[in-house]
Amino acid sequence: MDRYNWFQRNLHTLALSKKLIKEASFDIEKILFLKNRYPDNHIFITGLARSGTTSILNALYQTGDFGSLTYSDMPFVLAPNLWSKVHKPKKSDSNFFERYHEDGIQISQLSPEAFEEVFWDTFDDRNIEEFKNYVDLILRRYKKTKYFRKNNQNIKRIGTIRNLYPNSKILIPFREPLQQANSLLR
């Protein structure tokens, strides 16, 4: 968060820490922008930390075929279309810097990231169908028909994702255990 000024830090705190604000922003987003249902041909990447999920994410994102949230969608990741009307990326948003994990991976404000976890933290299993609305809103935002997401926490949601999107692919990379453990120690 040291890359943000006082206003940006407080906006992030407000937008991401209050369930009421997250739910309200999602409700407004649906009212204003939810128009289409997109085909079920998405890709979900999940796995243990340092297993290669970020590398796969970046490779797929570079194809330009998929819609996915990026750092520029922060902090209103549950209202990406509405936020895009307010926040216009600057040229400097494409500048790369080391991500906050300090693991050597370079990102920009236009890089994809696992922001769908905000959805899962906001809504419980009774609202699981809302995830389809969320994915459709992201696809509308990026004018794509295929969604992809890397989220290591989805390892516990494989059944849910499979039920929601039976035609989608779930990629689970595996890494040699000693290499993975060594990577986690760094």
Where are each of the predicted segments found?
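Conserved phosphate-donor/acceptor-positioning beta-strand/loop module used by diverse small-molecule
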Residues: K150-N152, I161-R186
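PAPS-dependent sulfation machinery
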Residues: S72-F148
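Extreme N-terminal, non-catalytic leader segments
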Residues: M1-H42
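A short, well-structured juxtamembrane/interface segment
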Residues: F26-F33, N127-R140, N154-R157
